[in-house]
């Protein structure tokens, strides 16, 4: 069954004190949020244990921003699914464009991370999307279909979320038109073995466009960057109309 999931990706922002202040401002604004909407906060690693204790028993689920494919080992700077599960994480972002661009993430390593997340009962949020050059060259579909074909080898689509993030719209203020995002997400859904996979849109989602985005038939939620750092703007996204 397709779920509605609004997930905030904090990237490399917020100390524990800032996270605490954020939650104090957010929680009171979620009292009327429909129960069927799932809210996820993907925080920096340093905040996971702290946030897990505060969020216990609330409607907000905890997410991480990366996971290694091994359970342990000499992998400096990495974190395992076993470790994430141990601190109460439920979701983990895999294959975000910034990981692919800045840290050499490939479809092969994305695939291994997806399977590692599922091995430990974590729900991965797989990010796929095209660059501005690929879109202008008419390669949007072929690029995304290639990502899906390689990333999802032997991945259980029953425990999976996909986020369509047009790279040219991330942090730029340029938003993919809602109908175009809906079209691409429909194409993504058509390539999956399971039509009930939750598919989010990510890319400059803001209070002034979230209602239009979430009104689209194929869009099940949002993966939010900058607007998730402010409790007022994030609560507006969660409580979209």
Swiss-Prot record:
Biological pathway: Carbohydrate biosynthesis; gluconeogenesis; Carbohydrate degradation; glycolysis; D-glyceraldehyde 3-phosphate from glycerone phosphate: step 1/1
GO annotation terms (biological process): gluconeogenesis; glyceraldehyde-3-phosphate biosynthetic process; glycerol catabolic process; glycolytic process
Annotated catalytic residues: 96 (electrophile), 165 (proton acceptor)
Positions annotated to bind substrate: 9-11, 171, 204, 225-226
Signal peptide: none
Keyword tags: Cytoplasm, Gluconeogenesis, Glycolysis, Isomerase
Subcellular location: Cytoplasm
Catalytic activity, reaction form: D-glyceraldehyde 3-phosphate = dihydroxyacetone phosphate
E.C. designation(s): 5.3.1.1
MF (Gene Ontology): triose-phosphate isomerase activity
InterPro entries, per database record: Aldolase_TIM, TIM_sf, TrioseP_Isoase_bac/euk, Triosephosphate_isomerase, Triosephosphate_isomerase_AS
Annotated HAMAP family: TIM_B
Family, similarity comment: Belongs to the triosephosphate isomerase family.
Function: Involved in the gluconeogenesis. Catalyzes stereospecifically the conversion of dihydroxyacetone phosphate (DHAP) to D-glyceraldehyde-3-phosphate (G3P).
Subunit text: Homodimer.
Name used for this protein in its record: Triosephosphate isomerase
Lineage: Bacteria, Bacillati, Cyanobacteriota, Cyanophyceae, Oscillatoriophycideae
């Amino acid at each position: 069954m397709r779920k509605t999931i609004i997930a905030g990706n904090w990237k490399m922002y917020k100390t524990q004190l800032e996270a605490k202040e954020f939650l104090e401002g957010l929680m009171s604004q979620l009292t009327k949020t429909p129960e069927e909407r799932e809210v996820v906060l993907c925080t920096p690693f340093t905040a996971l244990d702290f946030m897990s204790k505060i969020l216990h028993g609330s409607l907000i689920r905890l997410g991480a921003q990366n996971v290694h494919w091994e359970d342990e080992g000499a992998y400096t700077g990495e974190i395992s699914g076993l470790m994430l599960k141990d601190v109460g994480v439920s979701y983990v972002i895999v294959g975000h464009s910034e990981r692919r661009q800045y840290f050499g993430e490939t479809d092969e390593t994305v695939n291994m991370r997806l399977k590692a997340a599922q091995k430990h009962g974590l729900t991965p949020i797989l990010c796929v999307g095209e660059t501005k050059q690929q879109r202008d060259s008419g390669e949007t579909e072929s690029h995304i279909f290639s990502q899906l074909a390689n990333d999802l080898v032997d991945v259980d689509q029953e425990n999976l979320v996909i986020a369509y993030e047009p790279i040219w719209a991330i942090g730029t203020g340029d938003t993919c038109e809602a109908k175009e995002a809906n079209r691409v997400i429909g194409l993504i859904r058509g390539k999956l073995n399971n039509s009930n996979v939750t598919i989010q849109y990510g890319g400059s989602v803001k209070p002034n466009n979230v209602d239009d985005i979430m009104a689209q038939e194929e869009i099940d939620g949002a993966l939010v960057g900058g607007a998730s750092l402010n409790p007022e703007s994030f609560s507006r996204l969660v409580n979209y109309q």
